[in-house]
Amino acid sequence: MVGLKPPEVPPTTAVKLLGAGTAACFADLLTFPLDTAKVRLQIQGENQAARSAQYRGVLGTILTMVRNEGPRSPYNGLVAGLQRQMSFASIRIGLYDSVKQLYTPKGSDHSSITTRILAGCTTGAMAVTCAQPTDVVKVRFQASIHAGPRSNRKYSGTMDAYRTIAREEGVRGLWKGILPNITRNAIVNCAEMVTYDVIKEKVLDYHLLTDNLPCHFVSAFGAGFCATVVASPVDVVKTRYMNSPPGQYQNPLDCMLKMVTQEGPTAFYKGFTPSFLRLGSWNVVMFVSYEQLKRALMKVQMLRESPF
């Protein structure tokens, strides 16, 4: 490592974990209203309260929420969302390279597509297992409809939501929907990480761009699009099942079958536009920030370790 420039120094696992969590939080701050709009569109038609809102399109959903529930409503669940990213993104993104190296055969300096997919599935599943309670609380806040600042709220705050869910639904309620969420995030993580990894690798191999902002932007945009196309059906089932009151669905499969019979197969792509807008922009902000944060953190680490 001596003599290498900061961008060339391989980042440590700690740097990757911190950088991934911080970059994901920054991306969430910028794109959270799109995620909330996606949740509202995904559950629309599921019950009378959601049906009466008549959400139409991304911008229409956000404007309806602001008009009926106040300007802060698109950011309902942000605290839980940031808690989720610090635990969730740190693992699924920060540990991806380490797990990929673990699965790569000894003596090989190149990871196959299969190895990358396995790494993406592994870190995605690990992240969901740790961060599921934060995701449940985030979805509950995003899906809750308030007529105004004085309307009855089921949860007084984020910590109250954790306590209330655990008290009323048991500790298992905090891990509600974990199986569809593991499926969804294994798929999303593969689509995001593998697509980003491959596009970036090919762009650099063919000298189309240097390892800098334009390369990171192109790779991240492609990753966001692929992730949205592949993961939307599972994402809708996950959102509905996690937000449902006890007894509405027996299990995720029952939720899926009821969606097909009551709303048709197009229900699985409800909220696709905000999903793409959100995942596309989220990936661009996150990956670009992540790459820059890794370099900045390595510079700081090298300065601290330097004897001069």
Curated annotation (Swiss-Prot):
A Pfam entry, by short name: Mito_carr
| Topology of this chain in the membrane | Multi-pass membrane protein
Domain of life here?
Answer: Eukaryota
The main place the protein resides is mitochondrion
Cite the Gene3D superfamilies for this sequence: Mitochondrial carrier domain (1.50.40.10)
Identify the residue ranges that face the Mitochondrial intermembrane compartment according to the record.
1-10, 97-116, 197-213, 291-308
GO CC, any one term: mitochondrial inner membrane
GO molecular function terms listed in the Swiss-Prot or TrEMBL record? oxidative phosphorylation uncoupler activity
Transmembrane residues, as ranges?
Answer: 11-32, 74-96, 117-133, 180-196, 214-233, 268-290
Where is the segment annotated Purine nucleotide binding?
275-297
> Any idea where this protein resides?
Mitochondrion inner membrane
Give residue ranges of the Solcar repeats: 11-102, 111-202, 211-296
What is an annotated GO biological process for this record, any one?
mitochondrial transmembrane transport
Concerning PROSITE patterns, the annotation shows: SOLCAR (PS50920)
The record's keywords, sorted A to Z, are:
Membrane, Mitochondrion, Mitochondrion inner membrane, Repeat, Transmembrane, Transmembrane helix, Transport
Q: Which residues lie on this side of the membrane: Mitochondrial matrix?
A: 33-73, 134-179, 234-267
Supply the InterPro entries for this chain. Answer: Mit_carrier, Mito_Metabolite_Transporter, Mitochondrial_sb/sol_carrier, Mt_carrier_dom_sf
What is the protein's quaternary organization?
A: Interacts with HAX1; the interaction is direct and calcium-dependent.
The family annotation for this protein states: Belongs to the mitochondrial carrier (TC 2.A.29) family.
Q: What's its job?
A: Putative transmembrane transporter that plays a role in mitochondrial metabolism via an as yet unclear mechanism. Originally, this mitochondrial protein was thought to act as a proton transmembrane transporter from the mitochondrial intermembrane space into the matrix, causing proton leaks through the inner mitochondrial membrane, thereby uncoupling mitochondrial membrane potential generation from ATP synthesis.
**Which PANTHER family does the protein's record reference?**
MITOCHONDRIAL DICARBOXYLATE CARRIER-RELATED
The protein depicted here goes by the name Putative mitochondrial transporter UCP3
* Organism, scientific name: Sus scrofa (Pig)
